[in-house]
Design a protein with these regions (language model features):
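Conserved mixed alpha/beta catalytic, RNA-binding, or beta-rich assembly cores of soluble enzyme
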Residues: 314-323, 328-345
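Short, charged/polar "capping" segments at the starts of alpha-helices
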Residues: 36, 88-91, 256-261, 345
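His/Asp/Glu-rich metal-coordinating catalytic cores
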Residues: 2-59, 66-233, 237-240, 248, ...
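Polar/charged alpha-helical tracts
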Residues: 95, 111-114, 264, 305-310, ...
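Short, conserved active-site loop motifs that form the nucleotide-linked donor/cofactor pocket
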Residues: 56, 116-120, 133, 273-275, ...
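Short secondary-structure boundary segments
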Residues: 84, 253, 342
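Hard-cation-handling environments
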Residues: 198-325
Length: 345
């Protein structure tokens, strides 16, 4: 067995790892470098983006661009695997991005949409065989939903590739039991190290953040939250915080589609992912989907505006000019708060 870290050992993002055994190859992640990072020479990797790929497979740990962003550079015949819900979310995101005005960027995302049509999906503990290499995905908690670690077995050796994971999320309590059950007798660990050089970083748990939002929503009537559309657990926690603070919950149709993907796939496992779309009797967590008006901006029209101003709301926003008129309008009120809920690094 041979392990090669092609990229990711000396930087955050742009990850790609290779495990080779008897001519068969498993690659884990093939990502873009993070914006602002020093650009390195493009990678040319036999069995991944050139040469014979009949004995290769690429496994994607999660849908963040620094782990999946280079898939269009792979050989078209390469087998690619990804979590089922993660793939649905990623497809929704890329379809959305394929409509951005800049033609070059739009074409890039259209190419990704076409490429991911051929991706195979897996579920936790569903073993994948590549020659004599066996890979077992383990579900982990991360800001990207449906993320995985991998246990790789070949030539009598066992490797744990952690992917990105966290210990402060809603589903983190399953990490240690999962490792104790399925990651025994590990010979080598390939681990992410995002916070290794941030020893003084303060990390709140997602549960603590939800409580903070709940308290603030209760004190303030008009709440706008700038949040990544694919930070799924954070968004569901905002929904529950709104419900407990007796505020309405508002998002656009694209965000609603992502929430529906997760809810349909996972609400049977946890009520955390269950949204009461049918609620029309109480403002607590009442779900509204906003569509842009004729001028392509978001606004509260008709009977919606007095209802929201009576009971208050939490609205999800993104760095998009469509949301600006609403922000400008409600900026005049002392009851308005805007929250920046995005990783800054």
């Amino acid at each position: 067995m041979k392990i090669t870290i092609h990229r990711g050992a000396s930087q955050v993002g742009g990850c790609v790892t290779e495990i080779e055994s008897d001519g068969y190859k498993v690659f884990i992640d093939f990502g873009e470098q993070l914006p602002g990072a020093e650009k390195k020479e493009p990678l040319k990797i036999d069995g991944l983006n050139y040469g014979d790929v009949s004995k290769s497979a690429l496994l994607i740990s999660h849908y963040h661009g620094d782990h999946i962003g280079k898939i269009c550079e792979t050989n078209a015949n390469l087998r690619i695997y990804m979590g089922k819900t993660a793939l649905e979310i990623y497809k929704c995101l890329e379809q959305r991005l394929s409509f951005i005005p800049k033609k070059e960027e739009s074409e890039k995302h259209k190419e990704i949409v076409e490429r991911i049509e051929k991706i195979n999906t897996f579920k936790a503990l569903q073993q994948i065989k590549v020659g004599k290499i066996a890979v077992t995905p383990l579900f982990v908690d991360h800001s990207a939903f449906d993320a995985y670690m991998f246990v790789i077995e070949a030539n009598g050796k066992r490797i744990l590739h952690t992917g990105d994971f966290r210990g402060h999320g809603f589903r983190s309590k399953g990490l240690l039991p999962s490792l104790k059950s399925y990651a025994k007798n590990i010979d080598y660990i390939i681990s992410e190290g995002t916070n290794i050089q941030r020893p003084n970083a303060t990390i709140q748990t997602e549960q603590e953040l939800q409580k903070d939002f709940e308290r603030s929503f209760g004190k303030n009537k008009y709440n706008f939250v700038l949040v990544s559309s694919t930070n799924v657990d954070r968004i569901f926690s905002l929904y529950h915080a709104s419900k407990k603070a007796k505020r309405c919950f508002i998002c656009d149709s694209y965000q609603a589609k992502i929430l529906k993907i997760v809810s349909e796939n996972h609400k049977q496992y946890s009520s955390f992912y269950n949204i009461d779309y049918a609620n029309k009797t109480t403002p607590a967590g009442r779900f509204f989907v906003l569509n842009p008006n004729r001028e392509n901006f978001y606004s509260f029209d008709g009977e919606l505006k007095p209802y929201l101003e009576k009971y208050g709301f939490c609205m999800l926003i993104r760095s998009n000019s469509r949301f600006q008129p609403l922000l400008d309008e409600y900026a005049q009120s002392d009851a308005t708060r805007v929250y920046y809920s995005i990783w800054s690094g």
